[in-house]
């Protein structure tokens, strides 16, 4: 949704982004706004993100006191690769504009209702999806000399992958499938998980180490491992000047502000950070809201008022200053 109130030659612009996709969770909340679709709910606050952005745009539509062009971006596909942000940018909707900032927010139960959270520089991790299919020769569990055991190879692979964890890397395997039985070794096993990093160089190094580990295990166990690394979202890196401006504005508006720690979770907002000055901040909804990605998550609606007021004020500051 694009609004413009400026002479044709003024190309200044600001982009306000809200993600809008839901999650495959059956909602257990008993409220007026609960999901009407079984097995799907807004378990991560994206409905509140959309409500805040809608409120900002509605306010500007009634009193368009900004200069330049304001983009209201309701973005799908944040929760899964390749990320809706990458698909939006592939269409080049902001080409020819002087984009002063791409701004996004996310609800945060660990902050009090209405509190705003900021972090300059690196904020959220890059994320990749890992898949491994280890193929060997199965058979009777008593005849091990006749086997090329994919379970043993897979167990060693899992152990060595987890050993990669450190300050610059968070690697988890969340799914293992093998089949077989007490006396049957299967022909193959399957594993999948995620890799999260904060440095592009380190990201590439770990990708190569994963391939080397798999090849070494193949050689010693006589198996063949198919490694698939699905490159996902880049790091969310907040523009330091924008963080200073936003923090000062929030304090001037008498809002409570907290500085945020580095997070190992990921967000496709990182794609915007690679192309434009960007700011991704947190909107407190209180601990009583519950935990995101659960069937009872319900952000406190009182945060919406703060969310609208701050995002509107920030957009005005970005567009109206020379």
Where are these predicted regions, by residue range?
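Histidine/acidic-residue-rich, glycine-tolerant segments that coordinate divalent metal ions
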Residues: 23-25, 30-41, 47-48, 65-175, ...
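Residues at alpha-helix caps and immediate loop-helix transition turns in enzyme cores, especially N-
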Residues: 52, 84-85, 146, 206, ...
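Non-cysteine beta-strand/loop elements that form the S-adenosyl-L-methionine
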Residues: 15-17, 130-132, 280-286
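Metal-dependent amide/peptide-bond hydrolase catalytic core
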Residues: 151-322
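Hydrophobic/aromatic beta-strand patches that form the interior of the parallel beta-sheet core
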Residues: 14, 73, 101-103, 251, ...
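Acidic/His- and Gly-rich active-site-bordering loop/insert found
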Residues: 1-42, 51-54, 58-67
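Structural signature of FAD isoalloxazine-binding scaffolds in flavoprotein oxidoreductases
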Residues: 17, 52, 104, 126, ...
């Amino acid at each position: 949704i694009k609004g413009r109130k400026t002479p044709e030659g003024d190309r200044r612009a600001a982009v306000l982004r809200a993600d809008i996709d839901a999650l495959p969770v059956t909602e257990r909340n008993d409220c007026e706004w609960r999901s009407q679709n079984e097995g799907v709910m807004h378990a991560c606050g994206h409905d509140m993100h959309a409500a805040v952005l809608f409120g900002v745009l509605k306010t500007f539509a009634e009193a368009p006191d900004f200069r330049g062009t304001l983009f209201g971006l309701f973005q799908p596909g944040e929760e899964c690769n390749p990320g809706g942000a990458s698909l939006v940018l592939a269409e080049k909707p902001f080409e020819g504009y002087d984009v002063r900032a791409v701004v996004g927010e996310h609800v945060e139960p660990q902050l009090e209702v209405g509190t705003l959270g900021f972090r300059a520089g690196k904020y959220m991790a890059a994320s990749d999806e890992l898949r491994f299919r280890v193929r060997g020769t199965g058979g009777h569990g008593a005849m091990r000399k006749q086997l090329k055991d994919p379970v043993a190879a897979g167990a060693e692979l899992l152990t060595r992958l987890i050993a990669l964890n450190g300050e610059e890397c968070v690697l988890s395997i969340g799914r293992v499938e093998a089949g077989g039985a007490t006396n049957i070794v299967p022909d193959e096993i399957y594993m999948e998980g995620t890799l999260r990093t904060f440095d592009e160089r380190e990201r590439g190094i770990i990708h190569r180490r994963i391939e080397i580990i798999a090849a070494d295990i193949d050689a010693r166990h006589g198996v063949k491992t198919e490694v698939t690394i699905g490159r996902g979202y880049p790091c969310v890196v907040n523009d330091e000047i924008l963080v200073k401006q936003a923090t000062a504005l929030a304090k001037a508006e008498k809002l409570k502000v907290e500085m945020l720690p580095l997070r190992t979770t990921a967000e496709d907002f990182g794609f915007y950070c690679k192309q434009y000055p960007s700011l991704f901040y947190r909107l407190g909804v209180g601990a009583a809201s519950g935990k995101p990605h659960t069937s009872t998550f319900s952000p406190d609606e009182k945060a919406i008022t703060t969310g609208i007021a701050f995002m509107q004020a920030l957009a005005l500051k970005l567009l109206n200053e020379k």
